[in-house]
């Protein structure tokens, strides 16, 4: 009998739960259509579930006065939010409060005279939104995705460093350490979300203790990809999937212990589907042997 262990911290975080709840509640209160500006969270299956309820992801082409638009959990630049309100749309801000804290941090550092380094993925919606707030408070800064990106920061005497909320803690520390070697004054505001840290620590603990590790989450989810990379370093038999349909029977041949973790945008119902499918695969292999 296979032992399936779900990581202590896995799946929906506070910010994602809040965004999904706001989307569901908006359906009861809206007179017009309900949209999200882009996918509300990075999980295609949950986005599709909300779409079936009547919450449609959009880039804004079909918005009409009186419609409801929900700002995604990752946030958007302030100028975009202002443009939505000017169109006569009802705007519901589902930006994660922890992401809002990053917006406040970059403006605080700007007011204090620091050049801002944002450790994150350059094309991630959260980073794009945060850069919008940095512009709005007349700040200057760069995004650091790899250590090769820090060059511009080293030209400044005072550097303030923040992180995308779902950033890898080890890489964040590495960037801080490298910049501190070369810059006269460094101020660090650790804006990595506690939920991200807990999920990463849970994976570090579980991955070495199992034969196979399954990481569930959207392929476009930065925090899920980081869980996968962390797990893969500790357990080569790590696989990143979105749904139970992607599970391959050969992954589980001769396996006794399977670990499961999931990104912050992965709902419980998908985790349960994956767990059930693994049980079916392993029981089928026992019968055939």
From Swiss-Prot:
What does this protein need as cofactor? [4Fe-4S] cluster
Tell me which residues bind (2E)-4-hydroxy-3-methylbut-2-enyl diphosphate. 42, 74, 124, 165, 221, 223, 265
Instruction: Describe activity versus pH.
Output: Optimum pH is 7.0-7.5.
What catalytic activity does the UniProt entry give for this protein? isopentenyl diphosphate + 2 oxidized [2Fe-2S]-[ferredoxin] + H2O = (2E)-4-hydroxy-3-methylbut-2-enyl diphosphate + 2 reduced [2Fe-2S]-[ferredoxin] + 2 H(+); dimethylallyl diphosphate + 2 oxidized [2Fe-2S]-[ferredoxin] + H2O = (2E)-4-hydroxy-3-methylbut-2-enyl diphosphate + 2 reduced [2Fe-2S]-[ferredoxin] + 2 H(+)
Describe how the cofactor binds. Was shown to bind 1 [3Fe-4S] cluster per subunit. However, it likely initially contains a [4Fe-4S] cluster which easily degrades into a [3Fe-4S] form in the presence of oxygen.
Name of the protein this chain belongs to: 4-hydroxy-3-methylbut-2-enyl diphosphate reductase
- Provide the binding site for dimethylallyl diphosphate: 42, 74, 124, 221, 223, 265
Q: What Enzyme Commission number(s) apply to this enzyme?
A: 1.17.7.4
Which CDD domains does this entry report, sorted A to Z? lytB_ispH
Q: What Pfam families does the record point to?
A: LYTB (PF02401)
**Which residues are catalytic?**
126 (proton donor)
A single cellular component GO annotation: cytosol
Q: Name one GO biological process term.
A: dimethylallyl diphosphate biosynthetic process
Tell me the residue numbers annotated for binding isopentenyl diphosphate.
Answer: 42, 74, 124, 221, 223, 265
Disulphide bond pairs: none
- What is the recorded function of this protein according to its Swiss-Prot or TrEMBL entry? Catalyzes the conversion of 1-hydroxy-2-methyl-2-(E)-butenyl 4-diphosphate (HMBPP) into a mixture of isopentenyl diphosphate (IPP) and dimethylallyl diphosphate (DMAPP). Acts in the terminal step of the DOXP/MEP pathway for isoprenoid precursor biosynthesis.
- What PANTHER family does UniProt report for this protein, alphabetically? 4-HYDROXY-3-METHYLBUT-2-ENYL DIPHOSPHATE REDUCTASE (PTHR30426:SF0)
* Originating organism: Aquifex aeolicus (strain VF5)
Q: How does activity depend on temperature?
A: Optimum temperature is 60 degrees Celsius.
The pathway that the record names for this protein is:
Isoprenoid biosynthesis; dimethylallyl diphosphate biosynthesis; dimethylallyl diphosphate from (2E)-4-hydroxy-3-methylbutenyl diphosphate: step 1/1; Isoprenoid biosynthesis; isopentenyl diphosphate biosynthesis via DXP pathway; isopentenyl diphosphate from 1-deoxy-D-xylulose 5-phosphate: step 6/6
Keywords, comma-separated and alphabetical: 4Fe-4S, Iron, Iron-sulfur, Isoprene biosynthesis, Metal-binding, Oxidoreductase
For this protein, the record's HAMAP family field holds: IspH
Which residues hold [4Fe-4S] cluster?
13, 96, 193
Q: Which family does the entry's similarity section mention? A: Belongs to the IspH family.
